[in-house]
Amino acid sequence: MTTFNHVSDLNIPELNDVLMTLPELKTKTFDRTRFYITPEGNHYPSITTVLSIRNKEGLMKWRKRVGDDVANYVSRTAAMRGTKVHHMCEDYLNNENMERHKKEFLPYALFNQLADKALCNIDNIYAQEC
């Protein structure tokens, strides 16, 4: 397993001070849309929300072709799989033991593709989503 170096001192005092005082952002979900809320009360959409705004014509044609029940099942399954892969990536970057994830065959296979092609190019980690 690759071991990632988590850099805690960037040798840039001003940036270190900012990183140490960053508040934890709160989140709210409205109609299945997640927003991050700043201490000033500003709401910013999650990347998933931003990407979901893209043209959905192809997805709507697919949904019409397969029906709502199948489309909902496939969408829900894909979302759960994506969440599992996301957690695996976080654990991997945090140098955690990946053994417990092996029981999730498909998400683990997808994670391994990411690890082999993308995550392997990461060395120093300066900040990470919590």
Which residues make up each language-model segment?
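Metal-dependent nuclease catalytic cores that hydrolyze phosphodiester bonds in DNA/RNA
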Residues: 1-130
